[in-house]
Amino acid sequence: MPHQPPLASDSPDSRLAEVGVSRQSLCDGRMLHAVSDVVELPDGRMATREYVLHPGAVMIIPLLDDGRVVLERQFRYPVGRALVEFPAGKLDPDEGSLACAMRELQEETGYTATEWAYAGQTHPVISYSTEHIDIWFARGLTAGEQALDDGEFLDVFTATATDLLDWCAEGGVTDAKTLAGALWLQNVLSGRWALVWATADSPVHPQPAGPRYPVLRMDAK
C-alpha cells in the first residue's frame, strides 16, 4: 500500500502553518493581481509573503484514436522562446473546470471531444502564486477550426507518447504543467493510474475545487 503524504492539504500541521494577519495590494494589472500579506509564523514571529492571486486554469491531454497526443508550440515572452505544451487556459469568472477545458481545447486546437476524464490538480508555482491547474484527458476527438484569442499565435501538432516522454527526458520540454501531464500520460497508458471516462454531460465528473486564497485571521489586531 502506498505511503500517505506527510501533510494533507486540507488538514495542515499546526507546527508548519502560517496565518495571515493583514494584506496589502501591490499590483492590480490586466492579468495579475499581486498582494503582500503579513503572516504569523509557527514560532509567533511575523514575516511577509508576496504572491499572485490567480483564478486557476486547466490543461488538456488530448488523445487521438491512433495513440498520438495533440500538442502546441507557443512563444512565451518571459522566457524568450517557444515552448512545447499541452493545450491549457485560465478559468473565466464563474466558469466550471470541465467547461473551461472544453472551451480551451476547441479555441486553441480546433478539436472537440466526445469523452472526458478528470485526472487531478497541480500547483505549478507554490512559492508565489495561488494558481492551480486541473488536468483533464480528452478522447474521441474531431478536428475543427481554431478560435484563437486576439493576439494569440501558436502551432498545433501531434506526437507519439514515446516521443513526448523522450523530449521530456532530454530537456526539450521544460513547461512545468506539460511535464506533469506527461507523468500522468505515462502512468495512464501503463495502466498504473486509472481514469473514469464519460461524456461531458455525465454526472460522474467531479467538480474540482476552485481557487483557495489565503484567509486572513479575523481577530488580527
Q: Model regions: which residues?
A:
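Extreme N-terminal tail/first-helix region
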Residues: 1-28, 197-218
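Short glycine/serine/proline-enriched coil/turn segments at secondary-structure junctions
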Residues: 29, 78, 125-128
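A glycine-rich, hydrophobic loop/mini-helix early in the fold
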Residues: 54-81, 85-86
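Short helix-capping/linker segments at secondary-structure and domain boundaries
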Residues: 185-198
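Unchanged
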Residues: 47, 56-59, 64, 90-176, ...
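Acidic, metal-coordinating catalytic segment for phosphate/diphosphate chemistry
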Residues: 18, 23-59, 65
